[in-house]
């Protein structure tokens, strides 16, 4: 398990270096593999494509923050943890969030966080969300995603 995490993080760090000179939309798997000193088979064992590197890393941070809401961590604390993590890797996420591809971390984050809130809020509150409340959750997450890119 630790080795898998180390390999994934090496790919994340390599993508970060490559994004310093090339937009994520233009980075090729072969270039990333060469720079990370891994084979293509290893890359595809862990990731589906270049965007999956950024979305995996974002999900990894969500596992340590927002996904803990309702499990002993409150809403504010979870968000502070996430934003502190994003700030620690600000250069990576600033560049990764620039892509508007459907698979980009920006669009992925918006979708996955909205879905998580739509699931967790009724569990915590003990009542289903109304259609208006669901719309408010989606607007909140879209706005938060937009503000994260600023």
How would you name each of these model-derived features?
Residues 4, 32-53, 85-88, 92-96, ...:
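Basic/polar phosphate-binding segments, predominantly the helix-turn-helix DNA-binding elements
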Residues 5-16, 25-29, 34-37, 44-70, ...:
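An amphipathic alpha-helix adjacent to DNA-recognition modules
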Residues 14, 18, 143-150:
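Amphipathic alpha-helical interface segments
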Residues 66, 94, 148-149:
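Amphipathic alpha-helical segments within well-ordered protein domains
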Residues 77, 91-92, 121:
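Arg/Lys-rich, alpha-helical DNA-contact motif
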Residues 81, 102-127, 131-146:
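Amphipathic alpha-helical packing segments from all-alpha helical-bundle domains
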């Amino acid at each position: 398990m630790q080795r898998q995490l180390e390999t994934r993080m090496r790919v994340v760090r390599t993508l970060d270096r490559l994004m310093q000179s090339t937009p994520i939309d233009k980075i090729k798997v072969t270039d990333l593999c060469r720079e990370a000193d891994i084979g293509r088979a290893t890359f595809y064992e862990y990731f589906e494509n270049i965007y999956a590197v950024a979305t995996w890393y974002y999900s990894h941070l969500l596992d340590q923050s927002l996904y803990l809401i309702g499990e002993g961590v409150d809403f504010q604390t979870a968000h502070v943890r996430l934003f502190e993590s994003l700030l620690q890797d600000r250069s990576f996420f600033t560049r990764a969030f620039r892509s508007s591809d459907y698979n980009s971390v920006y669009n992925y984050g918006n979708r996955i966080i909205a879905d998580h809130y739509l699931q967790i809020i009724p569990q915590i509150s003990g009542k289903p969300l109304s259609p208006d409340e669901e719309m408010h959750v989606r607007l909140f997450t879209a706005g938060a995603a937009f503000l994260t890119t600023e």
